[in-house]
């Protein structure tokens, strides 16, 4: 592992309430689960943890409530090699919550309550201007207020900080924001929401990537689940396959991929090698239960890759 540029992650923090069950309930149906746990999550926090554990020099801009779960989350993040000084504690607010069902195939459905995450305002972003401006990269998702994502992207763009956006949860985005993004990592659903193109195969992945290139994004990585990633740089695309593993829980697969990917890119790994590194991290994560508890450390990722040679 080589020295890397600094990373700022801006995003959400949640307490995940996870129920494992054989199949998802249909409307009006009650289903008995076989395992329940509360774990720390939130797309921002998951990606920050993935970056911290995989070796990034990282600071995290986020908000928690002034409750006991918020204090516990902050303590845990600090043990994951994350600078938590930009994490704000919002007085009188609760830490964000996610309710998660995981079925027998490891698939999940998630509902969230923003809580303190909604307080991540443009003013709080502005207070971190210098940190963003001096970073090598800024990684964001869409569980934070869009105006704050936009504010951070503008600061980064003005200061030549790489802007990486994982556009999740899926939603339409203004062209003004997309024009500020250097790297975007949608899954198939998110890519369709952004481009209007259903990503059914590599041909349609290439078409969706081209739409995003035309909006000003140089590097488009469309994650395809078990089929890997469609990677396109300025219109030159290829599919980079992932690793075959027995999935137990896919809750943090995408977040682990994103955090590990940006870490590898900041270490100046070539894009295909960085994707392979991120694939390895995600492959380990899906063999474990929970969001942050599933995220691997750097030595685990390196050992996994060594076994693939």
Regions found by a protein language model. Give the residues of each.
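Conserved beta-alpha-beta core of the PfkB/ribokinase-like small-molecule kinase fold
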Residues: 128, 137-207, 226-229
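Conserved phosphate-binding/catalytic loop of the ribokinase/pfkB sugar-kinase fold
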Residues: 85-90, 100-137, 142
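Short gly/ser/thr-rich secondary-structure transition/capping motifs
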Residues: 81, 118-123, 163-170
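Beta-strand->loop->alpha-helix junctions that form or flank phosphate-binding loops
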Residues: 10, 35, 61-66, 85-95, ...
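Conserved phosphate-binding/catalytic region of the ribokinase-like
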Residues: 1-7, 171-176, 202-309
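Glycine-rich phosphate/adenosyl-contacting loop at the front of the ribokinase-like
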Residues: 1-63, 68-79, 246-248
């Amino acid at each position: 592992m080589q020295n890397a540029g600094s990373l700022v992650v801006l995003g959400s923090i949640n307490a995940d309430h996870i129920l494992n069950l054989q199949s998802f309930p249909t409307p009006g149906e009650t289903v008995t689960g076989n395992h329940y746990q509360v774990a720390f999550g939130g797309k921002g926090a998951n990606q920050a943890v993935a970056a911290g554990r995989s070796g990034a020099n990282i600071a995290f801009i986020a908000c928690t409530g002034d409750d006991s779960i918020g204090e516990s989350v902050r303590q845990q993040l600090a043990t994951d090699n994350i600078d938590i000084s930009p994490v704000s504690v919002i007085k009188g607010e609760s830490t964000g919550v996610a309710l998660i069902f995981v079925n027998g195939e490891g698939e999940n459905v998630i509902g969230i309550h923003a809580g303190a995450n909604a307080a991540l305002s443009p003013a709080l972003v502005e207070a971190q201007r210098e940190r963003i401006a001096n970073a090598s990269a800024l990684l964001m998702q869409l569980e934070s207020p869009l105006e704050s994502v936009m504010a951070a992207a503008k600061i980064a763009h003005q200061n030549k900080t790489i802007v990486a956006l994982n556009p999740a949860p899926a939603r339409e985005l203004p062209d003004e924001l997309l024009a500020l993004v250097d790297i975007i990592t949608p899954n198939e659903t998110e890519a369709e929401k952004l481009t209007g193109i259903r990503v059914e195969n590599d041909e349609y992945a290439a078409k969706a990537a081209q739409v995003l290139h035309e909006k000003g994004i140089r590097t488009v990585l469309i994650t395809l689940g078990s089929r890997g990633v469609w990677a396109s740089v300025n219109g030159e695309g290829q599919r980079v396959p992932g690793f075959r593993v027995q999935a137990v829980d896919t809750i943090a697969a995408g977040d682990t991929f994103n955090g590990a990917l940006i870490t590898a890119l900041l270490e100046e790994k070539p894009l295909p090698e960085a994707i392979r590194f991120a694939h390895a991290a995600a492959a380990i994560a899906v063999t474990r239960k929970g969001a942050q508890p599933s995220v691997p450390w750097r030595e685990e990722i390196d050992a996994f890759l060594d076994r693939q040679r």
